[in-house]
Amino acid sequence: MTNPLLTSFSLPPFSAIKPEHVVPAVTKALADCRAAVEGVVAHGAPYSWENLCQPLAEADDVLGRIFSPISHLNSVKNSPELREAYEQTLPLLSEYSTWVGQHEGLYNAYRDLRDGDHYATLNTAQKKAVDNALRDFELSGIGLPKEKQQRYGEIATRLSELGNQYSNNVLDATMGWTKLITDEAELAGMPESALAAAKAQAEAKEQEGYLLTLDIPSYLPVMTYCDNQALREEMYRAYSTRASDQGPNAGKWDNSPVMEEILALRHELAQLLGFENYAHESLATKMAENPQQVLDFLTDLAKRARPQGEKELAQLRAFAKAEFGVEELQPWDIAYYSEKQKQHLYSISDEQLRPYFPENKAVNGLFEVVKRIYGITAKERTDVDVWHPEVRFFELYDENNELRGSFYLDLYAREHKRGGAWMDDCVGQMRKADGTLQKPVAYLTCNFNRPVNGKPALFTHDEVITLFHEFGHGLHHMLTRIETAGVSGISGVPWDAVELPSQFMENWCWEPEALAFISGHYETGEPLPKELLDKMLAAKNYQAALFILRQLEFGLFDFRLHAEFNPQQGAKILETLFEIKKQVAVVPSPTWGRFPHAFSHIFAGGYAAGYYSYLWADVLAADAYSRFEEEGIFNRETGQSFLDNILTRGGSEEPMELFKRFRGREPQLDAMLEHYGIKG
């Protein structure tokens, strides 16, 4: 039987991939990669792009194209068999990457290339790829004595296993709690859309009534609208203690020891490489220059946002007391009374907006925005093999009708699919040795409610923003003009700059001119009425300071956890969290809350000592967008400038240089504060 992963495919043969194909395919690809490395090294100096970088890039590309659908399926269609196969590949991949990173011969080949005459003939992107490779050798311990190199490899392998274990615990804990409600009165206050979804969940399990889960589309409406305080508290407790030693499943999928070990190993790794701690190591590949700069940035922002956050909370407390006689707000009351206050102040709720954002309007509206700014058109293809019938596939064409890239769109929450929204690369753009250009392919994944009762999927405005955000990442990957592996698309882009294109795209969701075609009532097609639009815009910065303070809490917690780690004392995870809450949080939270235990961004994602990137990129995005505000939000020339200077350049140059080329100067904080309505 042929292994579909080992056939030559332009797009992954999803329906044919089975768990038993995974390990053999990855093993074969890794063997080919090793052979490519040995072949290149045996060739000997002098080295050129063609005899060194190109053959390695092609071998790596095959590996990436095999592993990408495996990793993706593990996220969107998890099963015990696939999970086990995926887990078996992690140590193999980690071991390979350490082997390459510590390969003396290969390191010397790259140094020979950089120090030789050929380097001057390379283009900007190629030079950057070579420089990055040399930097990565340093960060893989190339200069260390043998026993330390071996320890580096052990740590790297263990960390990849731990990150995966952490993720599995969060997924299992999230799926491990459900509640069936048979008496509809217990769900008083809940919007029709949430009730329909909960009913559909129950029916899918052949149960009568309403099934609630800890997936965001199920959890949020309960916290926001359900009048039943006891139910809100029960769900809040279950959600905020996932994968921990507390709550309804205490100890069952506990991430405490996993986090402790992850932090200790990261610290040891950083010190092996000569860094003071993991925060220093993390910044070696980022835009920010040193830990102090990051801490100053976060602390300064906290100082500016805190007074306004305190005021916002005081107003909420006063409102809950005056209107509902509530003496003390509990954590599970915040979202509920905030929604009531928002209604009271602006007479608008997310649910009122839902009918105006049916899926086809939101998706086609997004495409229209992209067409107006960049001259890019999306065309759907229905002949592509996908992992679930609901997944769609699109190609992007520019004004010369050239295919620039394509993407899979997977919008709805499902069982066995991890929560959240993300963009990932399926295929990266690169010029092959035979002269052909391989075009980029992306995965865009969200977790929205699917269509029920014959109505189309109806999105909240927040979900529309999420869709635009992920598509911003997608454009960065798909519209790249760089043809060099490793620095095309999102590859090689520093983590604190990678959120710029995504946060930048969100702005159009607030522009009346864009909302005119992003919205349209699912029954009548009429766009968002002016009265609702005005209310929505008025409510835009409702509790903005509280939002920023929450992001600052996450950012400071992550950064200080890594920067202040002391092996003698252990990780001090909860102590650090409580200390930071004292500094920035204004909303009280219970001591039994276990937020870190499901903070996948930093324990199982790429945001370790890097969560500050969201706020950092927010400054860049708001400032970049202010140029559109000055010159016109659909100004094609401004769009072209953003495309030429930022989106198409991938990781081929330093982000600050690219930003300055677009903006004509360094970024300034004012636009972001103004954007959130914060009087700094």
Curated annotation (Swiss-Prot):
Q: Please list the reactions this protein catalyses.
A: Hydrolysis of oligopeptides, with broad specificity. Gly or Ala commonly occur as P1 or P1' residues, but more distant residues are also important, as is shown by the fact that Z-Gly-Pro-Gly-|-Gly-Pro-Ala is cleaved, but not Z-(Gly)(5)
Enzyme Commission number: 3.4.24.70
Can you provide one Gene Ontology molecular function annotated for this UniProt record? metalloendopeptidase activity
Q: Which InterPro entries match?
A: M3A_DCP (IPR034005), MetalloPept_cat_dom_sf (IPR024079), Neurolysin/TOP_dom2 (IPR024077), Neurolysin/TOP_N (IPR024080), OpdA_N (IPR045666), Pept_M3A_M3B (IPR045090), Pept_M3A_M3B_dom (IPR001567)
PROSITE patterns named among the record's database cross-references: ZINC_PROTEASE
Write out the GO biological process terms.
peptide metabolic process; proteolysis
Name the positions where Zn(2+) binds.
H469, H473, H476
Pfam families in the record, alphabetically? Peptidase_M3 (PF01432), TOP_N (PF19310)
Protease is among the record's keywords: yes
Q: What domain of life?
A: Bacteria
Alphabetically ordered keywords of this record: Hydrolase, Metal-binding, Metalloprotease, Protease, Zinc
The kind of enzyme this is, by top-level EC class, is hydrolase
| Cofactor(s) the record lists | Zn(2+)
Q: Which CDD domains does this one have?
A: M3A_DCP
Family in the record: Belongs to the peptidase M3 family.
Instruction: Summarize the protein's role.
Output: May play a specific role in the degradation of signal peptides after they are released from precursor forms of secreted proteins. Can cleave N-acetyl-L-Ala(4).
Annotated NCBIfam families? PRK10911.1 (NF008159)
Which PANTHER family has this protein been placed in? PROTEASE M3 THIMET OLIGOPEPTIDASE-RELATED, SACCHAROLYSIN
**Protein name per Swiss-Prot or TrEMBL:** Oligopeptidase A
